[in-house]
């Protein structure tokens, strides 16, 4: 069936509601928009769905959500998981409550119990809840930090981590089999509740989650001692972090927490920001304004589903607030945990630090200094959860901390996804420790540079929308894969890791060895002088990402080298 035939069916079929038909009929004559909405089925990737909200097969709407859920239901039934049930959470985005309800009722119509949160909750609490309730799976409706027009649908398995092999491929296969809406089941909410299939969860789960967060604190006595002296500014960016972040800080004893009022309440339109991303300086404009008014020590922002944390801290020498990348804040927390656990005798002899292949190489130096294993995984926090499961099954390592450059980390194993709530808590504890020692967070970061090396990382993202964009991204990857360079700028290419082919090719001797990681469309260039760069298309957005890493003799030298490497790599890639 052509895209136009599918469009006409959606406009006329009684299965679709009148608002959907009205939205689509208004597009008559706009063939480009119709084609974009119907040229494909919104792809259910290895993590789930993500797309623009709207009518059409290539959009996030109740019909595509039901279709994906039917595929998930079929797989759960094949695994005899109906009675274990599925936990469901959602964020503050437009249509998130509706999509979560549609998912629950589709599962209920298939005889599967659901445990849906009564109102919005952070993604990591969903991960925790899957484990706590003994569910077979979990669903969270979120598009993380994407622009307001997006929403998404992420699937978790019974260990509380996002789906990984074999479940991801098996669920994908089941979703692909649902080719017609006549295959999709649903039921009335009142009937589902009466049948004991639809359950609502809330405060009791919040309390259990909060207790697990507080267990990760290493020195609550330092927090209490510095509670009156440290000033924290926080913004949830209109998302789910507001209540849990404030609660954990209050229960630990922090007294001076200032919340950005304009961004305090949940709002899927994100009226104060164009892009609710704590990686973006613009997202901090209101928070930094408040920080200057109250003379804050630390400024924090969580994204809409509260799994990523952005940070600014004051440099007392200049009086300016300095932005911390995810690598920087992650290293501060990691080094603090390792140092303090070693000091109090709780650092396990078989401890492991986990990071992604595009996260700072400073982690390697810190892990070596504290005698813990450094394990690298592909991008995506599902691989962190998978590693924790491997550790437990094999009794090999004990997870201590995990971080990724994209502003996510996890302390503890109560959840199996990145958690901005625990990241806020731990970073504020680090700040309290710094304050008790007469230094700032920025001073502590400088100390890490001086001790382990002046590591610097960067990221460039190209957005290429539509069919043409997807083809351009594929063409770029093919060219780089098939014609690897011997040099990138002044750097020699020592080795090329191609994770799609599972090969690491030594560019001098020609030796080929396996990468040891799952298949993924990622190219990683090992360069001379401890530099590196990596290229990967996004799995959820029409983007291709370029990552860079260098180490210099001081901060200025590393910044200079990073700029040179960035320019050289983008030139090579044909930017």
Regions found by a protein language model. Give the residues of each.
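An N-terminal, well-structured beta->alpha segment
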Residues: 5-103, 192-228, 240
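Glycine-rich phosphate-binding loop plus the immediately following alpha-helix
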Residues: 156-186, 327-350, 355-364, 420
């Amino acid at each position: 069936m052509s895209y136009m035939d599918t469009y006409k069916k959606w406009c006329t079929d009684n299965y679709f509601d009148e608002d959907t038909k009205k939205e689509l009929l208004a597009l008559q004559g706009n063939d480009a928009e119709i084609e974009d909405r119907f040229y494909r089925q919104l792809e259910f990737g290895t993590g789930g769905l993500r797309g623009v909200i709207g009518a059409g097969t290539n959009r996030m709407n109740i019909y595509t959500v039901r279709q994906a859920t039917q595929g998930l239901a079929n797989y759960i039934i094949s695994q005899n998981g109906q009675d274990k049930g599925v936990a469901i959470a959602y964020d503050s985005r437009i249509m998130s409550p509706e999509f979560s309800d549609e998912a629950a009722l589709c599962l209920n119509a298939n005889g599967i119990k659901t445990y849906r949160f009564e109102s919005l909750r952070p993604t990591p609490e969903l991960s925790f809840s899957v484990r706590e309730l003994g569910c077979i799976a979990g669903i969270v409706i979120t598009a993380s930090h994407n622009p307001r027009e997006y929403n998404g649908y992420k699937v978790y398995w019974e260990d509380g981590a996002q789906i990984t092999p074999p479940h991801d491929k098996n669920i994908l296969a089941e979703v692909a089999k649902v080719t017609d809406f006549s295959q999709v089941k649903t039921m009335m909410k009142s009937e589902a509740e009466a049948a004991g299939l639809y359950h609502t969860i809330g405060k009791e789960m919040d309390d259990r989650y909060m207790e697990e967060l507080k267990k990760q604190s290493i020195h609550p006595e330092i927090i209490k001692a510095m509670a009156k002296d440290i000033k924290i500014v926080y913004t949830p960016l209109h998302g789910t972090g507001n209540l849990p972040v404030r609660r954990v800080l209050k229960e630990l004893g922090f007294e001076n927490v200032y919340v950005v009022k304009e961004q305090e309440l949940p709002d899927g339109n994100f009226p104060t920001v164009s892009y609710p991303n704590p990686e973006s300086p613009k997202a901090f404009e209101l928070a930094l304004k408040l920080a200057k008014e109250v003379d804050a020590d630390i400024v924090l922002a969580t994204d809409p589903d509260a799994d990523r944390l952005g940070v600014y801290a004051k440099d007392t020498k200049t009086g300016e607030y300095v932005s911390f990348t995810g690598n920087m804040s992650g290293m501060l927390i990691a080094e603090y945990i390792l140092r303090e656990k070693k000091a109090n005798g709780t650092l396990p002899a078989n401890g492991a630090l986990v990071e992604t292949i595009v996260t700072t190489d400073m982690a390697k130096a810190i892990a070596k200094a504290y005698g813990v294993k450094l394990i690298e995984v592909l991008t995506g926090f599902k691989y962190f959860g998978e590693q924790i499961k491997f550790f437990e099954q094999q009794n090999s390592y004990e997870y201590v901390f995990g971080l990724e450059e994209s502003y996510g980390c996890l302390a503890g194993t109560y959840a199996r996804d990145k958690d901005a709530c625990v990241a806020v808590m731990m970073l504020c504890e680090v700040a309290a420790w710094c304050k008790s020692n007469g230094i700032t967070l920025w001073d502590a970061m400088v100390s890490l540079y001086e001790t382990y090396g002046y590591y610097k990382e960067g990221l460039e993202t190209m957005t290429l929308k539509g069919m043409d964009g997807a083809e351009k991204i594929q063409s770029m990857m093919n060219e780089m894969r098939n014609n690897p360079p011997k040099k990138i700028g002044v750097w020699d290419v020592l080795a090329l890791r191609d994770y799609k082919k599972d090969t690491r090719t030594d560019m001098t001797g020609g030796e080929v060895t396996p990468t040891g990681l799952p298949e993924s469309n990622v190219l990683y260039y090992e360069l001379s002088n401890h530099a590196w760069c990596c290229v990967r298309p996004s799995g959820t957005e029409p983007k291709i990402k370029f990552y860079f890493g260098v180490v210099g003799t001081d901060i200025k030298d590393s910044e200079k080298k990073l700029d040179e490497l960035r320019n050289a790599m983008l030139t090579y890639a044909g930017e």
